[in-house]
Amino acid sequence: MSNIVIVGAQWGDEGKGKIADTLAEKSDLVVRYQGGNNAGHTLVVNGKKTFLHLIPSGVLHKHTKCVIGHGVVVDPIALDTEITRLQDTGIEISANNLFVSESCTVITSYHKLLDAVRENSTTEKIGTTGKGIGPAYEDKVSRKGIKFKHLFDKDVLRSRLALSLAEKETLFKDLYKVEYPSLEEEFERLYTLGQKLKQYSADTFSIIDQAVSTGKNVVYEGAQGVLLDIDYGTYPFVTSSNTSVAGVYSGATTAGHNLDHVIGITKAYTTRVGEGPFPTELFDDTGLFIQKKGGEIGVTTGRIRRCGWLDLPLLKYSAKCSNLTSIALTKVDVLSDLDTLKICIGYKYEGKEIFCAYPGIDLYKVEPILVDMEPFSLDEVVTKENMPSALKTYLRTIENHIGIPISSLAYGPSREQILFFEDYFKKG
């Protein structure tokens, strides 16, 4: 058995879904442990794209069970829509293969409205997706949240909804001056959805614990990336959950169980959606080339992603934050045939050269130390034997700086276009 964690090692959008989908073929359980439908995973199978936001990437494998852990915030409307959309394409989703923690915090219309009006009312944009993620986590922490299991009990749901609305009502009326659904409207909407989704509600704590205890293969699928972590990320331009490996322990069930692999998913370059510092960002034709060739448009937001060179000081920082055991490098093909190729090995900051970022660093004030790398061209199928020497040098540069190995290499959109250097399911 293996317990494998997939963590985004950058600002999200690294290709976690593709790696999770590939590993799901040998997995008994794939578990989402944090975030919500602000995540966006694109899977390409036989040339067909499948977009996922809440449901784990194991859904394309009939033998694999999918779990949404208690650390996830769930929008019932989004969940119902995603289930229906996938079922309409012939993907099997039932109470036999999808399990939603009864303890998940629910996203309401009030959370989404509050998210939107806050973002639109400030001059300092965070770049929120507007999905209500942050406000839902706020209610969770302040003990005003609605749990998934509350959707099925009329009295409890109405009581919890009234508690959640009490403060927001004042904000909507007096501060933001916006219309909002009445308590009864929202109650009816949520209760109706709850009856439809009740079949998926489960004690996921026990499901995961049982799987691990009996030697099953479990993959924990993260959303976003370490650099968006509420504690480790580029605050305040972060999400509202622990996107690092810490989120596995708080948002799923691994207490008393060892993690065999913590894989940091990393693009061969760097991207970021929304606001925030980006030391290696490219503003020239090369950046535009990478954006177009890489199809760098957010699945969830539709926003164009900012692009830049691979940032090793930030990658090393992510590796330390999540105790990564290896790197899965994705989208290497996007860098193929570039005339110029660079990589950031360090920063000049406050009169010093540093080679690993840290929480207190002001990334707006760093000057990236860029080194030229030899460009390379890739064949349609990449093997260890035909891999260009320039690419091998690029990989060694990453490994030497980060201090951990690259365990897989993705060089195209389909699940077949991955070269594995390590068997994650082999012990020892």
Curated annotation (Swiss-Prot):
Entry-linked CDD domains: AdSS
Cofactor(s) this protein cannot do without: Mg(2+)
Positions contributing to Mg(2+) binding: D13, G40
Cellular compartment(s): Cytoplasm
Gene Ontology biological process terms, A to Z: 'de novo' AMP biosynthetic process; IMP metabolic process
First-tier enzyme category under EC: ligase
Residue sites binding GTP per the record: 12-18, 40-42, 305, 331-333, 410-412
Note accompanying the cofactor annotation: Binds 1 Mg(2+) ion per subunit.
One GO cellular component term: cytoplasm
Example of a GO MF term: GTP binding
Subunit structure: Homodimer.
Functional note: Plays an important role in the de novo pathway of purine nucleotide biosynthesis. Catalyzes the first committed step in the biosynthesis of AMP from IMP.
Entry protein name: Adenylosuccinate synthetase
Organism: Francisella philomiragia subsp. philomiragia (strain ATCC 25017 / CCUG 19701 / FSC 153 / O#319-036)
Top-level taxonomy: Bacteria, Pseudomonadati, Pseudomonadota, Gammaproteobacteria, Thiotrichales
Gene encoding the protein: purA
